[in-house]
Amino acid sequence: MIAIVVSVFMWLLAACLLVLRRGRAERNITYAALTIALATTLNIDVVYRTLDALAGGVNLVTLLADLTLMTGVFFLGRGVARASENQPLPIRFALSPVALLVALGLAITAFALIERGVTTTTFMLDLGTQSAAAAYSAIQFAYYGIVLAAMAVLGARQVQISAGLQALSPGVLVAGSVCGIFLSIVVIAMDLAHLSGNLALMTAIDLAYSPLYLMTFLFLCLGFASGPATRTVRAHSRERTARMLSVE
């Protein structure tokens, strides 16, 4: 159910951005919305089972969905970076293609070492006792956490130099990024608890997963949609004011 809700959020965001950002040269945010929407759609159970059966029934769609999501998060970070100047070196590296390629390479390597068995829609729950599976998940969420931390820093800087409605979009993005950082920490903690056999701890930590997952995507969607929406409203307001002045 959560996968469906998040997928709907992301496709709505993609549709909004395609309309509101029409004609703009900067496309990173639109690419991010489309790739993340695709990744979340691949994680819907019925879609996953159907496609994985076509791919041989060995959970290859898990890898496809996860690599797509990592790429989408990369585009998110690049989109935020384009709106900021004088970025520190650690932030530039965190949001660079090199960091993405390193993370993708590590994730693919870890995935190849997992004894995956047949199709399962609860991949980490079923296979999380394998060290390769724990590493595979941790690599992804470490990358997400790093990118989102960089986004939070850039967003906070943007809030400081903005006023009124202009501060809304970066402020909501900071909230989404912070939720995503905590989500990454929660997932890595769950991976370690599962790997160590402490299922009680894993279950306790899991209580935070769904709320953080939903809040992360909700705030990020609102943040990225509110930016172009605010600019559109302001543009219409300026046009209306100009017409009124010309009539006078």
Which residues does each PLM region occupy?
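Hydrophobic transmembrane alpha-helical segments in integral membrane proteins
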Residues: 1-11
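Alpha-helical transmembrane segments of multi-pass integral membrane proteins
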Residues: 21-42, 134-191
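Helix-loop junctions on the outward
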Residues: 23, 38-62, 118-124, 190-191
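A generic, lipid-embedded transmembrane alpha helix
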Residues: 29-51, 65-74
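Short aromatic-rich membrane-water interface segments that cap or initiate transmembrane helices
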Residues: 56-68, 127-142, 204-211
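The cytoplasmic-loop to transmembrane-helix boundary for the fourth helix
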Residues: 84-113
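Membrane-proximal helix-loop-helix units in multi-pass membrane proteins
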Residues: 104-146
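C-terminal transmembrane-bundle signature of multipass membrane proteins
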Residues: 149, 168-248
